[in-house]
Structures are given as C-alpha cells and as structure tokens.
Amino acid sequence: MLKVGILGSTGSVGSQALDVIRKYKDQIKVELLGASKLSENLINQIKEFKPSYVYVENAEEKSIDDIKVLVGEDGLRRAVNLDLDLFINAIAGIKGILPTYLLLKYNKTLATANKEAIICLGELLKDKYKKILPIDSEHSAIFQILKDSNQKEVRRIILTASGGPFVNMPAEDFENITVKQALIHPRWSMGKKITIDSATLMNKGLEVIEAHYLFSMPYEKIDVLIHPESIIHGMVEFVDGTVISNMSNPDMKIPISYALFYPERKFLSDNYLDFTKIKSLNFLKPDTEKFPLLKLAVECGKKGGVYPTVLTVADEIAVNYFLEERIKFTDIHKIILETLEKFDYNKLDSVDDIFYIIDKTINLATEIAKKYGST
C-alpha cells in the first residue's frame, strides 16, 4: 500500500490527484491532507479519505473525528517529516516554496506542480532535484522522454504552449482584456493564477526556468513553441535528428497518475487519442513582442541570482491585483518590470536569503501595484 500525503488538496491539482486515487483506493492510502484553511471542501475530503493527519495553515481545531490537525509552520514541519512514500505538493504560488524546501531537505520523494519553488530555490538545492517527480504536463513529458537518455545526446528540449486565449487577438486590444476573458483557457482546467500566467505566457517562461533546473539543461537548449491543439506536451530533439514527443489529450490526471505510480502506468479512462480525428498539429514561434513576459522570464533565468525569485514573486502580486480587477491586463508586465528594475538586494547565499528576498519583493511589488491600481 502506497502511503501518500497531499499538500494543497483542495486546489485544482490536489483535487485531481484525489480523483486519480479514488480509482486505486486498494493501492493508495492518503495519510495526510493539507490546505490553507479548514474549508467545507477539506472537511469532505477528510470524511472520505480518513487520513491520519491533516495540515492546515490557519485553524483552531486540534483534531477532527480523532484525526490529528497540524497547524501553522510547526505543523507543516511535522507534516513533511511523516514517514510516507510520496508527498504531492499541489500548493499554488509562493506558499509552496517552504514545503518544497523542507521536503527536499528531509530527502522525501516529492511530486510537485509548484514551479515557483523550483525557480526560487534554484541553484541552492539543485543536487536535490533528482528526488522530484514533475506533475506539470510539459515537465512530465520531458521527464518521461529523458529518463533513459544521455544528456550529451540531447540537442534541445521543446516545451509547448497552447498560446492561451489571446494568441490571435491584436496586441492593441490587450489593454481592455477582462478577468473573465483571461480565465477562459482554451484547453486546460487550472487554478486562477496559472490560468492568467498562461494568458500572458509568463507560465511558459517560468517553465523554461524550471526545466533548466530540473533537467540540468542549458537555456540555449530549451525552446518554446506555440501548439494550439495541446496534444504534444513536450519534445526532445536528439543530436542524430530524431525527435521524440509525448502526446495525449490535455488532462492533468495523466501526469499526476504517472508521478503517483512511477515507474508504472495505470489505466485512467477511455479518453485516448483518436488520430483519425486530429485534423492538424500546428506549431508557431511565440510572439515575444506581443507577450513580453515570456522573453523577460527567460532573461531573468539566464541572469540567475535574485532575478528569478523577484520575477516570480512580482508576478504573483501583479496577477492577484489583476484578478481583483484593480489593474489592467497590460499592467501585469509593467509592474513586474518595474519591480525588477527597482529591486536593490543581491545577496543570495542561503535559503534564508531567498525568504528575505521574497518578503522584500512582496513589499516592493505591492507598493508598485497600488500605484497602477490608482490610475
């Protein structure tokens, strides 16, 4: 019986992980569920899966139905120290950084969809990344292709992007994009923050940085292509000209299942590709004039140091302001760029430095976002 813990169980990825586990309750025991608050959704999950422990960021309860409730940072440290076979970090955004750090520090096997943690922890924990099973569809695709390959044989890896809802919209119309429009993703069902990042192509830029660390791949060997059908999730081109791709219908449960049962594969549904119904597979170079955040993210990745962390945190602040309808869609790029230009701290020698940089960036980006919100 595989013993699993899920942090962020009430979010999009966490909920889909539980959907997979429901099919294999005879093989998987959920020992830990975690969320930011003791919501009705979490309580229903507790009743169904009956974990031994529950982690909640903020709560007064000490137990629920005789299940131990772990609260706050002390509770988190206890949760990640549990003797489990696999932890899934499905926490969205920068809140997922501390759990990732602790899990890697304690040498736990980690399946993660939290790219922010990989990007911010960067070089400091790169020797630990071999313990990670990626859940992002693109990184899972590359992971599956590369696992039996020698990196010297790789010419480049290619991450695909749907292009988001605005790939065919004229740039001059971007200023009037609404939150409702930006949250309608053409292919994937995801959380709000990552859906906005997909609309700006920031998500793909962050994925380039993540791929650099996860696969020890030079930036010069990482390419991005717009692929509107979202059938091919990633490709690896080898030095002999061979290209191997990972293809499936767009469904997050597939990479989640692969991480859960690695190295085995399990039946999920009859939602197989019907190649006779695929009329075409299209690939385009991303327009970085129209979507400048993709280019900015890659530039920050190449610079290294504090830049990837500042970029990541500033993006989260700006996206939240947009989701609250306090700024325009086009202000997201402006806020991130101004935060990067005004950030004045360069020391990055320890994990403590990372958390200091995060706090400092939150304050600076919030101050800048408020300025745009008042115009």
Curated annotation (Swiss-Prot):
Its EC number is 1.1.1.267. This is 1-deoxy-D-xylulose 5-phosphate reductoisomerase. It is an enzyme of class 1 (oxidoreductase). Mn(2+) binds at D136, E138, E207. GO terms for biological process: isopentenyl diphosphate biosynthetic process, methylerythritol 4-phosphate pathway involved in terpenoid biosynthetic process. Keywords: Isoprene biosynthesis, Manganese, Metal-binding, NADP, Oxidoreductase. Its cofactor is Mg(2+); Mn(2+). GO terms for molecular function: 1-deoxy-D-xylulose-5-phosphate reductoisomerase activity; manganese ion binding; NADPH binding. Catalyzes the NADPH-dependent rearrangement and reduction of 1-deoxy-D-xylulose-5-phosphate (DXP) to 2-C-methyl-D-erythritol 4-phosphate (MEP). PANTHER family: 1-DEOXY-D-XYLULOSE 5-PHOSPHATE REDUCTOISOMERASE, 1-DEOXY-D-XYLULOSE 5-PHOSPHATE REDUCTOISOMERASE, CHLOROPLASTIC. It comes from the Bacteria. NADPH binds at T10, G11, S12, V13, K37, N114, E116, G191. The keyword Manganese applies. Belongs to the DXR family. 1-deoxy-D-xylulose 5-phosphate binds at K115, S137, E138, S162, H185, S198, N203, K204, E207. Pathway: Isoprenoid biosynthesis; isopentenyl diphosphate biosynthesis via DXP pathway; isopentenyl diphosphate from 1-deoxy-D-xylulose 5-phosphate: step 1/6. It catalyses: 2-C-methyl-D-erythritol 4-phosphate + NADP(+) = 1-deoxy-D-xylulose 5-phosphate + NADPH + H(+).
